[in-house]
Amino acid sequence: MSFFDKKQMITEEEALPGRNTRMPVAALHTVTGHSMTNVPEGMEVALFAMGCFWGVERLFWALPGVYSTAAGYTGGYTPNPTYREVCSGQTGHAEAVRVVYDPNVISYEQLLQVFWENHDPAQGMRQGNDVGTQYRSAIYPLTPEQEAAAQASLERFRAAMEAAGDYRHITTEIAPAKPFYYAEDEHQQYLHKNPYGYCGIGGIGVCLPPEA
């Protein structure tokens, strides 16, 4: 694969080898004060990719019912990748956010609404000015119920786009979750640590219709 061909997905055989050593993870979330790794009893996990993970993580940590969030990499092949490796396009991973949430306070359906309404799901291997396979739109369900909800929400959002006169093809990947690798600490809660930092995500002005 050409070094500059960042919009072309690689194969597993082409992926960088990675490493066995996991990325160090801070014990506590800078904003919520909760564990960055534990999932308390009764809580659930969701994985979303919708462009640069700095802005995406901030979207989700601000929601009532969200226990913690983490920026990381998933959907590809390279184990325990670095940010530089992911940005090379040679890991197959997307920049993603892991959301731990209380389903008694906020539903997976409500998380899907935030997902669809806050980025452009029809841009292929980019999001705005951020170009590369790592910026693709993706939902990585962890359960059959999440997968069914994700697929149904895609169909509803497609219909809403068409009703608004937008007939572009939705390129959002919906695939069973692969291992999630935490990003380096400097990327965790980045826009809390750097309030004036870059945030390149934004919606297209279309709302996700509610379930029938």
From Swiss-Prot:
Protein name stated in the entry: Peptide methionine sulfoxide reductase MsrA
InterPro entries: Met_Sox_Rdtase_MsrA_dom, Met_Sox_Rdtase_MsrA_sf, MsrA_MetSO_reductase
Assigned EC number: 1.8.4.11
Catalytic residues identified in the record: C52
SUPFAM superfamilies listed in its UniProt record: Peptide methionine sulfoxide reductase
GO BP terms, alphabetized: cellular response to oxidative stress; protein modification process
Gene for this chain: msrA
One function term, GO molecular function aspect: L-methionine-(S)-S-oxide reductase activity
HAMAP family: MsrA (MF_01401)
Lineage summary: Bacteria, Pseudomonadati, Pseudomonadota, Gammaproteobacteria, Enterobacterales
